């Protein structure tokens, strides 16, 4: 894939390639560099955990077991921005979002010894993906999609997205 080549060009090794997703291992610098330099990615996600869940109880318990305190500070503002489910027993996006948020709150209540979160600090958007009963929970490090990089605050309708256009150009022999 074009994105795979872009990641290699940044100096990172690919650990997995799937439909619509390329996984690589890197540090905090890699996250920043990926958000700045990847032209064909829609967003850069930091995987917090992956586990199997066929019931909402399993989803809650496994989410609560993840070390959220490593990623979200005591005053962090967090919410589940998106949940999607494909070929999984758990399919209600709103229920998945609610249960994941509740599990994170319960974990952080214990770790930070508080009963209430002000959530007045930095934002930590969370994305949940279920594929064949395997849950992947990630922090969204990009915020808005990467095709909205600030150079054009209001984009008009286009026949293709900027990231797809970048990929098509990268597949041609043309060099800037």
Model-identified regions with their sequence ranges:
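Non-catalytic nucleic-acid substrate-recognition regions in nucleic-acid-modifying enzymes
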Residues: 1-124
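Glycine-rich adenosyl-nucleotide cofactor-binding module
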Residues: 130-176
């Amino acid at each position: 894939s074009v994105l795979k080549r872009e990641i290699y060009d940044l100096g990172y090794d690919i650990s997995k390639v799937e439909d619509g997703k390329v996984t690589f291992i890197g540090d905090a610098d890699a996250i920043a560099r990926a958000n700045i330099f990847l032209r064909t990615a829609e967003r850069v996600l930091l995987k917090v955990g992956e586990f199997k869940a066929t019931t909402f109880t399993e989803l809650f318990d496994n989410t609560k077991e993840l070390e959220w305190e490593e990623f979200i500070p005591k005053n962090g503002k967090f919410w589940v921005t998106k949940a999607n489910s494909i070929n999984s027993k758990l399919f209600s996006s709103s229920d998945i979002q609610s249960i994941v948020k509740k599990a994170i709150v319960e974990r952080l209540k214990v770790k930070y010894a508080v009963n209430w979160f002000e959530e007045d600090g930095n934002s930590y958007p969370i994305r949940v993906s279920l594929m064949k009963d395997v849950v992947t929970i990630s922090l969204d490090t990009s915020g808005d999609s990467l095709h909205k990089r600030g150079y054009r605050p209001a984009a008009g309708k286009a026949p293709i997205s900027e990231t797809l256009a970048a990929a098509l150009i990268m597949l041609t022999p043309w060099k800037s």
